[in-house]
């Protein structure tokens, strides 16, 4: 095997493993991590968890997508003309398309958030002084919705469900590419027999 043949085989291996990891990570996010956010006790903690998870996933998912698509493209162009199988190009396109899938899938638009009331709020000192006055009062009312900055749980649920759908689409596309890569590599390694007909 020549140096080019070895490097092409190595590139195919790296691309296939990266595509398999991308498929597994996308599936784990859509089936385990995102549904767990909906079971958090408050919508504020779910919203914070969603933003933290989204920010933490951008770099690894982009790296896996790049490591999945670039080796297949490079191996397609480095391979000798007789070994340039179209599955290399198709797999690279599917890996790239899996990163674009979340943009293409429509997400439900949450209703606009309620703006805070225009009435001036009490200063923190005034709130503290008022809390001493009603400390022993059994009939005191809890803080109103205006006093507590609240995040709508339905908005968070819509965001989580939209992100889950996009990661499921990413999983499906990358799984199709992974299956194509495995079958293609298996076909590359199959012994080629030449039959002469006389």
From Swiss-Prot:
Keyword Cytoplasm: no
Keywords attached to this entry: Autophagy, Membrane, Mitochondrion, Transmembrane, Transmembrane helix
Residues of the signal peptide: none
TM spans (from-to): 17-37, 60-80, 86-106, 171-191
Bias kind Low complexity: ranges: 112-121
Compositionally skewed regions (Basic and acidic residues) per UniProt: 126-142
Subcellular location: Mitochondrion membrane
Parts forming coiled coils: none
Membrane topology (UniProt): Multi-pass membrane protein
Keyword Transmembrane helix: yes
Record GO biological process: autophagy of mitochondrion; macroautophagy
GO CC list: mitochondrial outer membrane
InterPro entries the UniProt entry points to: ATG33
Residue numbers spanned by region Disordered: 111-147
UniProt record similarity statement: Belongs to the ATG33 family.
Function: Involved in the selective degradation of mitochondria via autophagy during starvation and at post-log phase. Autophagy is required for proper vegetative growth, asexual/sexual reproduction, and full virulence. Autophagy is particularly involved in the biosynthesis of deoxynivalenol (DON), an important virulence determinant.
The protein's name: Autophagy-related protein 33
Source organism per UniProt: Gibberella zeae (strain ATCC MYA-4620 / CBS 123657 / FGSC 9075 / NRRL 31084 / PH-1)
Gene that produces this protein: ATG33
